[in-house]
Design a protein with these regions (language model features):
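A short, structured loop/turn motif at beta-sheet edges
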Residues: 10-13, 64-67, 86-96, 141-145
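Short, hydrophobic/aromatic-rich segments at coil-to-beta transitions
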Residues: 41-49, 64-73
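Short, surface-exposed coil-to-beta transition loops
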Residues: 2-4, 55-59, 79-84
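Hydrophobic pocket/interface hotspot
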Residues: 15-20, 26, 48, 62, ...
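Short acidic, glycine-rich loop/turn motifs
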Residues: 52-54, 74-76
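Hydrophobic ligand-binding cavity/cleft-lining segments
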Residues: 1-41, 160-161
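Beta-strand/loop substructures that line and gate deep hydrophobic ligand-binding cavities in soluble
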Residues: 76-134, 150-152
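Short, highly charged C-terminal tails/helix-capping segments
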Residues: 38, 136-161
Length: 161
């Protein structure tokens, strides 16, 4: 079970990689980010701290840092999700795809698999899809205009605003 969103840009792959590898990069394009502080940077083993507009706080632990992006764990001991940031393309056209693989047990405290799946399809998946679509919109906005997004620029979100 996952959600993902993708943006394609007429920009070099290296430009996308440069942005997502910058310390505190979420401050530029994440519409629900209050602040994104660095604990340890860059490369495998990097850790940053994300505070959402609603005050929720998570550490993000990076691993599998490659020439095509990175993977991260968000949520610390609770392990809320694995998130893949994948950059593809060449020197003229490229894309960023972000996939969220949630640890469903942290969202639903019910062991019944049928109820978990129903809850996933009816509530969690639409909420996470809306969230990641907003993040991709912010990324696209920043890459095209080189101006930071403002809080809730593309609308609010029940979980993070």
């Amino acid at each position: 079970m996952y959600v993902e969103s993708k943006v394609e840009l007429n920009l070099p792959k290296s430009k996308i990689l440069d942005l997502i590898r910058q310390p505190g990069n979420l401050n530029k394009y994440h519409p629900f980010c209050k602040k994104n502080d660095i604990i340890s940077w860059p490369g495998n083993g990097s850790v940053d701290h994300l505070e959402y507009l609603n005050g929720m706080k998570f550490n993000r632990e990076f691993y599998n840092w490659t020439d095509s992006g990175y993977d991260l764990r968000i949520g610390g001991k609770r392990n809320m999700a694995i998130v893949n940031w994948v950059v593809e393309g060449d020197e003229s056209r490229s894309s960023l795809r972000i996939r969220i693989n949630p640890n469903i047990k942290n969202y639903i405290q019910i062991e019944n698999r049928l109820i978990q799946r129903l809850f996933w399809f009816l509530y969690i998946k639409p909420m996470l899809q809306s969230y990641i679509n907003h993040v991709i919109k912010g990324f696209n906005h920043f890459m095209k205009t080189e101006t930071n997004v403002i809080q809730n620029q593309f609308g609010t979100h029940r979980w993070f605003s």
